[in-house]
UniProtKB/Swiss-Prot annotation:
It catalyses: P(1),P(4)-bis(5'-adenosyl) tetraphosphate + H2O = 2 ADP + 2 H(+). Gene3D superfamilies: 3.60.21.10. It is an enzyme of class 3 (hydrolase). Keywords: Hydrolase. GO terms for molecular function: bis(5'-nucleosyl)-tetraphosphatase (symmetrical) activity. This is Bis(5'-nucleosyl)-tetraphosphatase, symmetrical. Belongs to the Ap4A hydrolase family.
Amino acid sequence: MSTYLIGDVHGCYDELIALLAQVEFDPRRDTLWLTGDLVARGPGSLEVLRYVKSLGDSVRLVLGNHDLHLLAVFAGISRNKPKDRLKPLLEAPDADELLNWLRRQPLLQVDEEKKLVMAHAGITPQWDLETAQQCARDVEAVLSSDSYPFFLDAMYGDMPNHWSNELSGLARLRFISNAFTRMRYCFPNGQLDMYSKEAPEDAPAPLKPWFAIPGPVSNAYSIAFGHWASLEGRGTPEGIYALDTGCCWGGELTCLRWEDKQYFTQPSNRQKSLDEGEAVAS
């Protein structure tokens, strides 16, 4: 019985299936962890959701920012962007079933036995695990309720960018969703920077990757995350696993087998384009 952690799929269904075949994944005995951003950019978002949903208890996933954006499009709050290639999913006969399932998925996974935590973007160093779990529950409760469109309408924005237990209402929920699904860099005091996306060696001072600032969670648990393709899976401290390696941009899909920490990769079926970083079919 093995635990496989896979980075952002982004609708790259064929690569996901090929990678699972490579590691001989068997849902009857193995468990699959997914770092979020199941959808958008790749051609197979519909197939990815159908497959992942079919795995039932054999999969543990977290929501990413693209998953939340898809839910906002589904709710009529945001417009579908052609580059996200979501039209087949939104027009599918089982779209309601799939997306209502998706909005009931968590923002945080914790395995106490493995001392392993997973979130799409990571864990802000301002939180201990108890705070992170409570914050995740706060957003999950709203997303799974009938009032979820009100949150999705208010989630877009970069403020507040500093955690306080005094935060309340939609401002609190926006910080939580940004920390779990959009965070990359922090100031030394833990305040989020929502603008910089470059690789750490190119980031302006005094910004640091969130994982470079010691925090209560990273001191006690391993953390797996996706979201940050420009890291290319490198440059993180021991116990911090960056799993997004840019499959939808022409990179590869990466899998970590937890038990022996062995990595497996599946090359993208797409090639890198020089046109504004977009990927085109090969």
